[in-house]
A protein has these predicted regions:
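Acidic, glycine- and Ser/Thr-rich low-complexity intrinsically disordered tracts
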Residues: 27-32, 37-157
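Structural detector of coil-to-beta-strand junctions
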Residues: 16-19, 42-43
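Long hydrophobic segments that form regular secondary structure
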Residues: 1-2, 6, 11, 15, ...
């Protein structure tokens, strides 16, 4: 199966260890236009944590992992099975970092976020795509997405 992870805003506070797992059986992965605001450390762990694979290296075919914003360039473990490319680094400067409401995660650093997304297309060799298509009309707060998407889950207007 193909996995599409795009236009999300992911926040974890400094006291949380972020665990990164990519199953060796993966084939067809797209991770793009996300904001990874991870204040603490991260660690690579083996596959599905309920049934961890035995580890080892393998190339995950049909992978697109690009155009994501990371708070710091040391976030993604170097031994993870997929590695980001064409990444951006910097502080999204959320309205209320650590808050409990979605609106707390409106990015204020517009220069880093606005219109910096890429258009999402099918993963190579994906004959189906997504049932509803790839273009998202509205963000999580109901803001209309126009032209080039922004990074993260919230469209800046």
């Amino acid at each position: 199966f193909n996995t599409y992870i795009y236009n999300n805003t992911i926040f974890t506070k400094e006291s949380i260890l972020s665990k990164i797992a990519v199953d060796k059986a993966s084939n067809g992965v797209l991770v793009a236009n996300n904001i990874f605001y991870i204040e603490g450390e991260s660690k690579h762990v083996l596959g599905d944590q309920y049934k961890p694979d035995k580890g080892g290296s393998v190339e995950i075919e049909n992978t697109i992992f690009q155009n994501n914003l990371f708070l710091k360039n040391s976030y993604w473990p170097k031994n993870a099975l997929i590695q980001p490319s064409k990444s951006l680094f910097g502080n999204a400067t959320f309205r209320n970092t650590g808050g409990e409401k979605i609106s707390d995660y409106v990015p204020l650093n517009t220069k880093l976020i606005k219109d910096r997304g890429i258009v999402i297309n099918k993963i190579p060799n994906d004959s189906i795509g997504l049932d509803g298509g790839f273009k998202v009309e509205f963000d999580i707060l109901g803001n209309k997405i126009t032209d080039i998407p922004d990074l993260g889950a919230i469209e800046l207007n």
